[in-house]
Structure formats: structure tokens, C-alpha cells
Swiss-Prot record:
GO terms for biological process: DNA replication, removal of RNA primer; mismatch repair. InterPro entries: RNase_H2_suA, RNase_HII/HIII, RNase_HII/HIII_dom, RNase_HII_arc, RNase_HII_hlx-loop-hlx_cap_dom, RNaseH-like_sf, RNaseH_sf. Endonuclease that specifically degrades the RNA of RNA-DNA hybrids. Its EC number is 3.1.26.4. It is an enzyme of class 3 (hydrolase). A divalent metal cation binds at D29, E30, D130. This is Ribonuclease HII.
Length: 244
């Protein structure tokens, strides 16, 4: 990547003054929906319409398709050159919400909160968002119902992070933010794997921790099937030893 590219791009972005009639574009996405360890991160990237070509000039893709090094490079560029907001939902907060809700509703609430942050200041807004439910139309209707401006233009599609660079940018922000948090966990807990239920290292870490501490680590989502199964197996093993 050209070393001067970031500086040139940064200089070409106008100061983001809060002008009601100025059209802005928002891209929203999340990272960490499925893992048993760590937070879910929901992010939004905002650009003005006249500066949309600046973000489109970047070779952005869905964050999962980029190398770690390239994600981090773009993370820095996006943060420096555009306005970014994010919500980090810790495991305990996800567990609390899951008692009365589900992942789709939790995401919708976070998406709408981030969007309304800008809708309070701007009237002319277009939103690109990665639809997190099986029905794009149902997601669109539920999302719009939570917005303070019902007239806002919304593009809600599956795999929007692969189709629209503004959503790719939000995906990168969310992914790198979560990855950094996972790395900080490793400093405290050692190798915990990726945090996904199917990762053998993650499962081994959880199993070992529960055996040693008789509870889940604070970084685990207790409402996940993987966590519930491990706790159940631990309780059954204790009962088996007592019976013997």
C-alpha cells in the first residue's frame, strides 16, 4: 500500500461539520455474532455523499476475506479519515439480553442506536446495512420501525459487506475491534483459540477452566449451548463421583 495514500486521503476529506441538508451515507455491520467467547461488536462508518468516492477508492472487502495485516491497515485508515461509532456488547451483557430477547433483536437494537445517533443531526441520510435475519424485508421493516426518521433511505441486504464498500468498512472496524479484545484475553488466559464453539482450542480452554474453577470464565457467553453443555457435563461428573 502506498505510504502516502493515507495522508492524501485524509487531506481530501472535508471537515465533517453537522449540516442538516448535507447528505450522509452510513454503513453498518457486526462482528462476533456466533462465538462463545468475547463480545459482539456493532459498528457504523459515516461519510458525506460527496466523499463517498474516497471510500470506494479503497480496495475494501468483507473483513473475513482480508489478511490480518491488511485489515489493520484499513482499520487505521478508516478511523483516521471517516467518522466511526461502535457498540461493544460484553458477554455478560449478551447473556442478560438473551434472557428476554434473541440475537437478531439485540443486533437490531444496536444498529438502530448507532443510526439514530446520526439521524438526530442529519435529515438527508442513506443507510447501507448487512441484514442479519433470513428475510431481508422483515429485517428492513423491523430496523426502520426503530429509527427516529422513518423516511430515511435504507439498503438492507444479505452479504452487504461483500457488495458495498461502506459496509465493508464497518465490517473491518467491528472485526479488528473484536480481534484486539480477543488478543487481550490471551494475555490473561493463554491460548483460547478463536472463541468460536467449533474451535478445538476454544473448547479445550473452556473445559479446562470449568474443571479447575467450577464455573465459566468471565469472557464466556453462558447462554450459548456450548457453555450450557460443559456446565452440565461438569455437574454430572461430580454426581457420578459422589455416587461411586
Amino acid at each position: 500500500m502506498n505510504k502516502n495514500y493515507k495522508n492524501n486521503l485524509n487531506e481530501s476529506i472535508n471537515n465533517p461539520s453537522k449540516i442538516l441538508n448535507e447528505k450522509i451515507i452510513l454503513g453498518l455491520d457486526e462482528a462476533g455474532r456466533g462465538p462463545v467467547l468475547g463480545p459482539m461488536v456493532i459498528s457504523v462508518v459515516k461519510v458525506t455523499e460527496k466523499d463517498l468516492d474516497k471510500i470506494n477508492s479503497l480496495d475494501l472487502k468483507d473483513s473475513k476475506q482480508l489478511t490480518k495485516k491488511r485489515r489493520e491497515e484499513y482499520y487505521n485508515i478508516i478511523n483516521e479519515c471517516f467518522e466511526v461509532q461502535k457498540i461493544v456488547l460484553a458477554p455478560e451483557k449478551i447473556d442478560e439480553y438473551m434472557k428476554t430477547s434473541n440475537l437478531n433483536k439485540i443486533e437490531l437494537s444496536a444498529f438502530s442506536k448507532l443510526s439514530n445517533h446520526f439521524l438526530k443531526e442529519y435529515e438527508n441520510v442513506k443507510i447501507f446495512i448487512d441484514a442479519c435475519s433470513s428475510s431481508e424485508q422483515s429485517f428492513l421493516n423491523q430496523f426502520k420501525a426503530k429509527l427516529i426518521n422513518k423516511k430515511v433511505e435504507i439498503i438492507a441486504e444479505h452479504k452487504a459487506d461483500e457488495k458495498y464498500k461502506i459496509v465493508s468498512a464497518a465490517s473491518i472496524i467491528a472485526k479488528v475491534t473484536r480481534d484486539n479484545i480477543i488478543e487481550s484475553y490471551k494475555e490473561e488466559f493463554g491460548d483460547i483459540g478463536s472463541g468460536y464453539p467449533g474451535d478445538p482450542k476454544t473448547k479445550e480452554f473452556l473445559k479446562r477452566f470449568v474443571k479447575e474453577h467450577k464455573k465459566l470464565p468471565k469472557i464466556a457467553r453462558g447462554s450459548w449451548a456450548t457453555s450450557k453443555k460443559l456446565l452440565k457435563e461438569f455437574e454430572e461428573s461430580k454426581l457420578h463421583k459422589w455416587v461411586k
